[in-house]
């Protein structure tokens, strides 16, 4: 594929030598939306492009992690996928829309530092962004989520976006699913609630992504099982859900066991997540309604 120099940096040429006659070269890329020009976006083959809308949160993560943890982890993961190069996804284009670093986090509002949208505002925001993405001609949208408080809203709106905008919509959520299960095999040392919030998983990822923001000397482990009494049916995982807020189940703001976290685990988990996500994207690329 041809490149050109723009301000000293190589940039993919959108048009071949016959561009003046209307000929275009196909563009294949893994990129962030905000780094593309309008013409680069317009030139993408919409039948071979998946747009990812990353959703995260700004909320308390215990005494040892920054409030931007969910957003930092998600952004780092996106950077690592992009760093693998365009050839890492031969099935077409992966375009990461600008991340939404605020979500629905009202469960954490009793702790300082949390910023949240109401359910109504968050729904409207997601719908407007998806409408804008569809207006650029894209047909396939993935809601790519790193915050458990967003999960119900994303699952709800995915069908509405299909009905209202005609988009093929998918939700990749690494909470309340088995997304991390294989990656944690052989390295997880914490128990049932060891991986949940400001936990072994998130703390390990942050030790790898942004170690200067992690205060391991302040990390505490907290198991919410006592708050659920019987812990058989009514748990934070279900099968019977409760409308709990974070302060109902933890004093520290931690749900899990961050003291088991290590940077080595974080490295392995990022590698695992990159590989798994590319596999998921490959399957999504083959699906259309």
Residue ranges and their predicted role:
Residues 15-28:
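Short, Lys/Arg-enriched N-terminal segments with co-localized hydrophobic residues
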